[in-house]
Amino acid sequence: MGAALLVLGLGAARSPAATPKIGGCPVFPAFKGSATARSGANQSAWNQNVSEAPVDPRSGHYIARITSLGGNQVVHPDFGGNGVYGIPYTTVGPRQRRVRVKVTGYPDQSDFGRAPIPPGAPVEGGSDRHVLVLQRHRCDLFEMYAAHYVGGHGHRWNAGSTARFNLHSTRLRHDGWTSADAAGLSILAGLVRPGEVRRGHVRHAIRVTFEETRRAYIHPATHYASDLCDPDLPPMGLRLRLSHSYFHHNLHRFPAGSQSRVIFKALYHYGIINADNGGTGANWFITGARSTRWHDGDLNRLKTVPGTAFVVVDSRARVKTPC
């Protein structure tokens, strides 16, 4: 790949304006001129502006197949509800001691058996029960799936799978490895967070789910979670964004200074990355942090954006599949 193709291999993609930060930690920064930045897809792809990236030649096939699934077919912010919905996360300092974590589902693809997880770490509602903990002084992120606090000696947690990401590093997980998310990606990196929205910019791609996905993945994803080989279904890691025409003709519908306008702009500039299978009908569900600072009436404006307003970004990366 030529040097101009950057982390996704996108001929006309732009470099990120600024690396997002959480708890004082930069989230997967691209180090200009480094081997990591030149070597193709890596974690810093999250932060790449894809508004000028070319459209995948098969974009129409993907969108038509997602539409054929039925169920929800508009952008659905899966967060809000006065702090009921969304995925929570917490940050800890150096005094938070490491506790035992027993991995019950995917031990061979998990990263840790001990981690600085507080006994009271918030757990996502529903069946996925994600727990996300950022260790601020090391910028180490610990994510768990199907997490349950057991307590007892050592304040133990049980989890279906675990993943550790150092936010200074852009290294991908091993091919074939899951994480706390089906695609092998970091969950926290793709959450819409109220603080960044309040500051007026979401400078990263947003996590999205679809009811059915393909038995395949595209970097930066490293794992699939499907038995379906239909080439028109979205693989894990598929990147989409709003089309030029839809964005420019509809931006005026989102009031200046509103949460919905900031997120709408992010859907165009940074897009969405397919990261997990949703439940029945759960297409175009975008994920945000659990918080009472969301304004549901405003976020509902995003529900007027149809899935057909999106195009698939041509990453020029190889789709990895056993099909």
For every predicted segment, state its role.
Residues 18-323:
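Short, surface-exposed polybasic-aromatic patches that bind anionic ligands, especially phosphate groups
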Residues 1-3:
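N-terminal export and membrane-targeting signals
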Residues 7-21:
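C-terminal region of N-terminal signal peptides and the immediate post-cleavage residues
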